Amino acid sequence: MERITVTLGERSYPITIAAGLFNEPASFLPLKSGEQVMLVTNETLAPLYLDKVRGVLEQAGVIVDSVILPDGEKYKSLTVLDTVFTALLQKPHGRDTTLVALGGGVIGDLTGFAAASYQRGVRFIQVPTTLLSQVDSSVGGKTAVNHPLGKNMIGAFYQPASVVVDLDCLQTLPARELASGLAEVIKYGIILDGEFFTWLEENLDALLRLDGPAMAYCIRRCCELKAEVVAADERETGLRALLNLGHTFGHAIEAEMGYGNWLHGEAVAAGMVMAARTSERLEQFSSADTQRIIALLERAGLPVNGPREMSAEAYLPHMLRDKKVLAGEMRLVLPLALGKSEVRGGVPHDVVLSAIADCQQA
């Protein structure tokens, strides 16, 4: 069992990583006997895990209600969020309740925002079931729903009480979702840890076949890197923005193509190549390192080009609504070397458009 602490003073919390955690009531600390829980999951995961998690919580004396939401990025919306509020009010649940997010990034983000908002804030626990959510979205307290004009535009910084990563969940993960999660894994190597990037080049095949020790190390290292960044910059005023490598481009793809048509990791993968190409044009990143990124993404089964039906010019309106924009100026996360990156403003639009055009599908 691996345990990592996200250090935020009184709001610090553990990330527990192991196989078989759904069999152990102690995995869901700080829940105690007699407390009330609302389990939030989706219709795909409910048949796989809902009864198991409900059973282990009830074994510990926890009072469990549940709400099952539709599955997909397009349901990460205010309308579906209201479904959670209605379920909480109908039971009813008070300020002493705990929300448990049992699912991937959509469930985690939406449940976290529900917890931040319901009766001005209640406790919640992240139980991520996808690789992407285990290495990224469940850690750090970013919660949100989407708006038709932009991804994650309505949300709050709100930290969980704990994160429970059961490695067994990856056994039921579709191959496309596994690849999507690997995009965020590769991101950490590009922006923060060149040695980890090299490790990924050497061990990607083991990750693709869900080798236990390799996957446990991979998730632990990603969570360590994320925890260090969040502890240093919880509200993304500086260092934490680096975690958005590829996201400014990727969010444009997701919004333009319709949420869910491109998985988040797929869009981020193409976006990371666009960021590398932009950095190349500014003469601060080598084409050889761009090729290493492309090769690793392709081995993971990820796209390295944007959608062919989306012109380079179609990206800009979305990118100019990005949350990193300051005083109307687009700011991009750009790699400087493998393991080193920066947030840069003032990149000429023609440079960005040229990089995007270079990454369009033929």
Curated annotation (Swiss-Prot):
Alphabetical list of InterPro entries matching this protein: Dehydroquinate_synthase, DHQ_synth_AroB, DHQ_synth_fam, DHQS/DOIS_N, DHQS_C
Pfam families the UniProt entry points to: DHQ_synthase, DHQS_C
GO molecular function: 3-dehydroquinate synthase activity; metal ion binding; nucleotide binding
Pathway in which this enzyme or protein is active: Metabolic intermediate biosynthesis; chorismate biosynthesis; chorismate from D-erythrose 4-phosphate and phosphoenolpyruvate: step 2/7
Cysteine disulfide links: none
Enzyme nomenclature, EC number: 4.2.3.4
Annotated cofactor note: Binds 1 divalent metal cation per subunit. Can use either Co(2+) or Zn(2+).
Protein residues bound to Zn(2+): E184, H247, H264
Domain of life: Bacteria
Keywords associated with the record: Amino-acid biosynthesis, Aromatic amino acid biosynthesis, Cobalt, Cytoplasm, Lyase, Metal-binding, NAD, Nucleotide-binding, Zinc
One GO location term (cellular component): cytoplasm
Top EC group: lyase
Location(s) in or outside the cell: Cytoplasm
GO biological process: amino acid biosynthetic process; aromatic amino acid family biosynthetic process; chorismate biosynthetic process
Catalytic activity as recorded in UniProt: 7-phospho-2-dehydro-3-deoxy-D-arabino-heptonate = 3-dehydroquinate + phosphate
Gene3D superfamilies: 3.40.50.1970, Dehydroquinate synthase-like - alpha domain (1.20.1090.10)
Cofactor: Co(2+); Zn(2+); NAD(+)
General function of this protein: Catalyzes the conversion of 3-deoxy-D-arabino-heptulosonate 7-phosphate (DAHP) to dehydroquinate (DHQ).
Record HAMAP family: DHQ_synthase
Family: Belongs to the sugar phosphate cyclases superfamily. Dehydroquinate synthase family.
Listed name of the protein: 3-dehydroquinate synthase
